[in-house]
Each structure stands twice: as C-alpha cells, then as structure tokens.
UniProtKB/Swiss-Prot annotation:
Protein name: Imidazoleglycerol-phosphate dehydratase
Chief subcellular location: cytoplasm
Alphabetized CDD domains for the sequence: IGPD
UniProt GO MF annotations: imidazoleglycerol-phosphate dehydratase activity
Source organism phylogeny: Bacteria, Bacillati, Actinomycetota, Actinomycetes, Mycobacteriales
InterPro entries in alphabetical order: IGPD_sf, ImidazoleglycerolP_deHydtase, ImidazoleglycerP_deHydtase_CS, Ribosomal_Su5_D2-typ_SF
Subcellular location: Cytoplasm
Enzyme class: lyase
Amino acid sequence: MTDTTLRHRTARVERVTKESSIVVELDLDGTGRTDISTGVPFYDHMLTALGAHASFDLSVRAEGDIQIEAHHTVEDTAIVFGQALGKALGDKAGIRRFGDAFIPMDETLAHAAVDVSGRPYCVHTGEPEHLLHAVIPGSPVRGTGEPGAPYSTVLNRHVFESIALNARIALHVRVLYGRDQHHVTEAEFKAVARALRAAVEFDPRVSGVPSTKGTL
C-alpha cells in the first residue's frame, strides 16, 4: 500500500510563444478551487468547471492574440494544462489509473473515459454537426469590463486532443445525444473532469505503479 497521507501532487508550467503566454498551476489533491483568466470568458467557464468537478486546485493565466481569434489561446492553454497534469502525476504510483463518467446536462448526455497509460491518444466523437460552426459570444471579462473573445465549439476537439497528447493519457470523449452547443460542451468538460478525478485518485489497494509492466 502506498503512503499518500502527506503527498500533494503539484505542478507549475509556463509556456511563452509569439502567439500566447500561459502559466498553469495545478494541485491534483486540491478541493476544486479555481482562478482562471484566459480572455475567453466561455473557456474560463469550462476550465472552472473542469477544476471544480475534478477536485483539482487550478490556476490559469493566459494572454494571447485573441484580437485575431481565440484558437491559439485556447489550444495553447490546453497544451500547458496537459503538461502540468503529466508533471503532477509523476511516476503515477498508487493511482487507480482508469476512470470514466457519464454527465447529463438538460437534453445532453456525454461520456468520458481515461487511461493514465503513458500512451497518448484521443477519440472525440458524437458532437452534433452544427457544433462545427457554432460560436458562443464573448461576455465582458471579469474585473475589466472589456469584451472577451468568442469561443468556437469546433475548438472542443483541439482542447481534448491537446490535453491527452501532452499529459500522455488515453482520453475518449463522446456525446451520446444533445443539441445546445453550451450544454454539449459543458457536459463534455464535466465528464472529462469526473473521469480524471477517478483516474488520478489514490487506490489504497495499489502498491506501486498500476501496470504489469512496472511503468506507465
């Protein structure tokens, strides 16, 4: 049995490019406290939901070229979150490794499954076709009153792929049914959050890394 009494798995990752500047701080053993600022209000809402429902303490500070569009900032933030997740997991000793969750939101039902395998892969399926073209308007950014960038729901797949590839996890996200672009997207993020929560939590019956290979 792994002694996890005093262990907090944390990471801080910073990434700066010509398109964005991102800092993510993550505590996998938190209580769901979040402090998110990306300049894309709907994305802030989704990352807040992810942190809260995964019970991660999550801080995100992102500045990007949102005057062009939100794509770079959204994708780069997901990359850095994935890197922080992988770093915080460390050697993965004592974790459950697998997790999945169904999340209903009004007319929508979404499902996510995670394997903290060290083999990055993402499957994203089932979104209604109109989400390829849907845009959620940007509300005023909290604390500034300035208009935030709109969020195109075609970015959902980019987010989940970026998290999976950079955290080195297998992540499957599917929408069983749904219509409203807000509900579909939020159900997906919450399903991913709950699946991650289950996968990264400690299993008192597991000693060492949960793999017959001895490493993940």
